[in-house]
């Protein structure tokens, strides 16, 4: 088996790469995917989003090592093991990231990845329904929509933000990237619009694209050049030959793992594992970043939440309606209102993210209380805490060692305490007077810094946005793994293109910027001139220097 380009992983970036690298018909593309098909309602029905993440069939099911600042809990760290990768098991929330995020990338050594550079790629990939004219793409493969916004609790949340003095935005992915507004979703015609649906399946209709379902064990490197990929398929070991390049798009956990198994990574660690060092790159597996969040939950005094739909019978009714018409409650992820806020004056960009949900549920999808309720997922998005991905053993089937070092900076605790108190302020606004019941979580008795910290240690969870473990940077940066053209430094014909190359985590969810990374990397791989830089300047809050709102 051979192809011009061999892509490891069919996730958000990998699917986009397969689509763009094969677009002109001149190059053969082979995609290696360890998972399987995405067929069936568990993935395709938006309201069923909790199911695929809980199924070993679709999820690698990783856990962190015990986190010392979180009562030594092992934090769940899901990654998609299916075509579409994590875009097939995520919450379908679409966030590009803030302009300052990408300007920061360039400052950190990723030349050519500033906001002006990446905005044209976001436009190229989008098919926006209702986004801000001039700022959004309208004919790309990735459909992006807003929900129906019919539940009164959604409107109450946005109105509460206004009453508290915060900005509102008609399109947080457009010019005004701060405030309360409608959440955007990767949903189209009532179905999850994953990277597989948007990019991979159309690409596979071309004669020059093929997918192999197998487990990539290592990259074959000969005389400093990547020449293929060793895979395990059906109990047999095979080698897929790359005539031009190998591109790794296997996730922020598995991309560094695969590089290390192939001899690319921190030299001492590789020697400890008995792996021959092909390129000593200490940055491989370092710089692990993520977002954390907690659920703030409140009883609703009116029966307007989704609580009535939680019993199995009514879930079945919603599922049947979706199967018949692709409509009803099953056609939404129920994340239809959100906010991006600054925690303090003087900040250039929002650092707090809110997802609002018109029901109070636990992480396992069960009701948090035997009553109607509502909640927000809230978190600080710009933590300075950094972790690592290392090998557990030289066995390719062994899970990687994930150490996030969550909450290792004093600022993290300060910001999350602020999240608790700010949410109480928001839920205390007049907009919620008709709905506000008792506080379920954290609970009204949790007031002091010490009480809030104890709550956070037990209830903070990952928002499932890992990145940064194969950092993109300047060639003379000893911790950079890839250069700004996504080429692995020290090995020819090898690239990495997924969220692992982010120099710094972006605000919000990472599916959007991961797809953009695949889009832009494809142009670098093909030697194309990058899309023309944008001269559009996003809105800047005129009160930013003196106010948080």
UniProtKB/Swiss-Prot annotation:
Cofactor: FAD
Residues reported to bind FAD: 4-33
Top-level EC class: oxidoreductase
An annotated GO BP: glycine betaine biosynthetic process from choline
Family annotation (PANTHER family): CHOLINE DEHYDROGENASE, MITOCHONDRIAL, GLUCOSE-METHANOL-CHOLINE GMC OXIDOREDUCTASE
The enzyme's E.C. designation: 1.1.99.1, 1.2.1.8
Recorded superkingdom: Bacteria
Keyword Cell division: no
Pfam families (UniProt xref): GMC_oxred_C (PF05199), GMC_oxred_N (PF00732)
Pathway: Amine and polyamine biosynthesis; betaine biosynthesis via choline pathway; betaine aldehyde from choline (cytochrome c reductase route): step 1/1
PROSITE patterns given in the database record: GMC_OXRED_1, GMC_OXRED_2
Keywords: FAD, Flavoprotein, NAD, Oxidoreductase
Region (Disordered): 529-549
Active-site residue list: 465
Family, similarity comment: Belongs to the GMC oxidoreductase family.
Signal peptide region: none
Gene name of the record: betA
Protein name, per record: Oxygen-dependent choline dehydrogenase
Molecular function in Gene Ontology: betaine-aldehyde dehydrogenase (NAD+) activity; choline dehydrogenase activity; flavin adenine dinucleotide binding
Catalysis: reaction(s): choline + A = betaine aldehyde + AH2; betaine aldehyde + NAD(+) + H2O = glycine betaine + NADH + 2 H(+)
InterPro entries linked to this entry: BetA (IPR011533), FAD/NAD-bd_sf (IPR036188), GMC_OxRdtase (IPR012132), GMC_OxRdtase_N (IPR000172), GMC_OxRtase_C (IPR007867)
Free-text function comment from the UniProt entry: Involved in the biosynthesis of the osmoprotectant glycine betaine. Catalyzes the oxidation of choline to betaine aldehyde and betaine aldehyde to glycine betaine at the same rate.
